[in-house]
Amino acid sequence: MTKKEQERNILAETEMLSEEQQAEILEKFDTESKVRKFSGKRVAFIVAAIAIFYSLFHLYITFYPMPALQQRAVHVAVGMALVFLIYPTYSSQNRTRVAIYDWLLFLLALASAGYLIVEYTNIVTTRGGIPNTLDIVFAIMTVILILEAARRVTGWILPVLALIFLVYPFISHYSWIPRKMMTRQYDLGDIFGQMYLKTEGLYSTAIGASVSFIFLFILFGAFLAKSEWASYSMI
């Protein structure tokens, strides 16, 4: 059987499937098919406004940079906020409206960056990066939000891998851990303070590269794709 005949057979089999089955197959392989299709203009306007702010923010900090921790926190927080509005909790959820708890997650995502912006001076100068109870609460909340946002977009694999590495520092001092993999005992402040209050954890070099280069590259590509310049570039 030739390759063209195989393609015809696959196409014929696909046409025999119901719309629901076709949508299920598309959703499995196409991430964009999982997003919500808003029935009202209000939520669509809010999402568009946040996306425009997100783009303008990255252009602004290119010329007027903020402290690395703050700009990376905003980058992650607004990205998460958009995920909670655009991606449903699970595939069978109603995709024409945003659930109340998704609005709550949206606000908490923004709060994760807002706290670092408001408390930045106290964190860096007054406390020298040593976390207090409120810091730890916001750190744990931010980690949970990131894991949930990753699950909605990519599935369970990445969040589970992240959880394994997150749990490891809490158990790495026990005697049943192989000697070469043992570490000293860490507490919540050590782990979540490092992850949330410094640029070696959640807001590390990878996020820095996303803020400074990757997002701008994608933004420029999206601009070209939606403008007439794309047709000229193909000439």
Positions of predicted regions on the chain:
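Membrane-interface loop-to-helix entry segments
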Residues: 99-106, 130, 134-137, 147-172
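Generic amphipathic alpha-helical segments used as scaffolds and interaction surfaces in large
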Residues: 40-43, 128, 150, 207, ...
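Membrane-embedded alpha-helical segments and adjacent helix-loop junctions characteristic
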Residues: 123, 143, 160-163, 171-235
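Short secondary-structure junctions and interdomain/linker hinges
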Residues: 63, 121, 154-157, 174
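Hydrophobic alpha-helical transmembrane segments
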Residues: 60-65, 145-152
